[in-house]
């Protein structure tokens, strides 16, 4: 009996971050591969000025400071990222840390607003 691709995607989508990490390790062991990202060097030369003129489309939301109300900030981080309680607490305790990466401007602004409403200091890069 073959498993449909949709069933696999649904099962993976329902997993926690910890379960996904264990799954990746199992794939690495079973197939002898690495999940490390491959770094690709960009073209060198005089094109640097043109790249700066392009509008940025992906943003990173950085938690700068947790503030006085850590519990609310941890709840906001969990809501934004889907992390478990311990992972969210570690992220908040380790500030400054990125909360969301490579997101559109609207999503980044919304995440920053939620963090600030919870009492944290956040910035968008």
Curated annotation (Swiss-Prot):
Keywords recorded for this protein, A-Z: Ribonucleoprotein, Ribosomal protein
GO biological process, one term: translation
Family matches, as Pfam families: Ribosomal_L12, Ribosomal_L12_N
Keyword Zinc-finger included in the entry's annotation: no
GO CC entries: cytosolic large ribosomal subunit
Molecular functions (GO terms): mRNA binding; structural constituent of ribosome
Keyword Ribosomal protein part of the UniProt annotation: yes
Subunit organization: Homodimer. Part of the ribosomal stalk of the 50S ribosomal subunit. Forms a multimeric L10(L12)X complex, where L10 forms an elongated spine to which 2 to 4 L12 dimers bind in a sequential fashion. Binds GTP-bound translation factors.
Biological function: Forms part of the ribosomal stalk which helps the ribosome interact with GTP-bound translation factors. Is thus essential for accurate translation.
Family statement: Belongs to the bacterial ribosomal protein bL12 family.
Name the UniProt record assigns to this protein: Large ribosomal subunit protein bL12
Lineage: Bacteria, Pseudomonadati, Pseudomonadota, Betaproteobacteria, Burkholderiales
């Amino acid at each position: 009996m073959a498993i449909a691709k949709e069933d696999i995607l649904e099962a993976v989508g329902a997993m926690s971050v910890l379960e996904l990490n264990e799954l990746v390790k199992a794939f690495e062991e079973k197939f002898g591969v690495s999940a490390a990202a491959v770094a690709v060097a960009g073209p060198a030369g005089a094109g640097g000025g043109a790249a700066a003129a392009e509008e940025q489309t992906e943003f990173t939301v950085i938690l700068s400071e947790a503030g006085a109300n850590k519990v609310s900030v941890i709840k906001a981080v969990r809501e934004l990222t889907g992390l478990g309680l311990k992972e969210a607490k570690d992220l908040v305790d380790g500030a400054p840390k990125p909360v969301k990466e490579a997101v559109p401007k609207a999503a980044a602004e919304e995440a920053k607003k939620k963090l600030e409403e919870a009492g944290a200091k956040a910035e968008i890069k």
